[in-house]
């Protein structure tokens, strides 16, 4: 049995398969998931697991070069935006409109759906390298 890092086998496999600049998405329960993109559905009820809890676990196990968020999060969910900025200090941040954000999700290796039910609690994580 694995002792550290991501225990979910689907998430662990996706993280292990990422190459430089590949992307994964951590999403609230309302973000549409495009056909053809791997869906890892963790949502068990509203709020569980939370977006920030899942982000923390994934970020601890992934080299992240860049973060993309919908610019609407700034005015519509400032608390989540602030927490993301506090948790992810090193990567570059990019803000795009929500429609562009949804277009970018079509290229993701996987979308991890949480139980989060607050506006624009979604992030695209761009894989970096460990060297």
Swiss-Prot record:
GO terms for biological process: D-ribose catabolic process. SUPFAM superfamilies: RbsD-like (SSF102546). Pathway: Carbohydrate metabolism; D-ribose degradation; D-ribose 5-phosphate from beta-D-ribopyranose: step 1/2. Homodecamer. It catalyses: beta-D-ribopyranose = beta-D-ribofuranose. GO terms for cellular component: cytosol. Its main location: cytoplasm. Belongs to the RbsD / FucU family. RbsD subfamily. Its EC number is 5.4.99.62. This is D-ribose pyranase. The gene is rbsD. It is found in: Cytoplasm. Keywords: Carbohydrate metabolism, Cytoplasm, Isomerase. The active site is at 20 (proton donor). GO terms for molecular function: D-ribose pyranase activity; intramolecular lyase activity; monosaccharide binding. Substrate binds at residues 28, 98, 120-122. Catalyzes the interconversion of beta-pyran and beta-furan forms of D-ribose. It holds the Pfam family RbsD_FucU. InterPro entries: D-ribose_pyranase (IPR023064), RbsD-like_sf (IPR023750), RbsD_FucU (IPR007721).
């Amino acid at each position: 049995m694995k002792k550290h890092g991501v225990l979910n086998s689907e998430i662990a496999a996706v993280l292990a398969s990422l190459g430089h600049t590949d992307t994964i998405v951590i999403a609230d329960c309302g973000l549409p998931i495009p056909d053809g993109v791997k869906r890892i559905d963790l949502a068990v009820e509203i709020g569980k697991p939370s977006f920030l809890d899942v982000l923390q676990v994934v970020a601890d196990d992934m080299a992240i070069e860049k973060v993309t968020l919908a610019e609407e999060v700034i005015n519509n969910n400032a608390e989540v935006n602030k927490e993301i900025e506090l948790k992810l200090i090193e990567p570059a941040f990019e803000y795009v409109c929500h429609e562009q954000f949804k277009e970018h999700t079509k290229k993701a290796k996987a979308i991890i759906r949480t139980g989060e039910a607050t506006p624009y609690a979604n992030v695209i994580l761009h894989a970096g390298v460990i060297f």
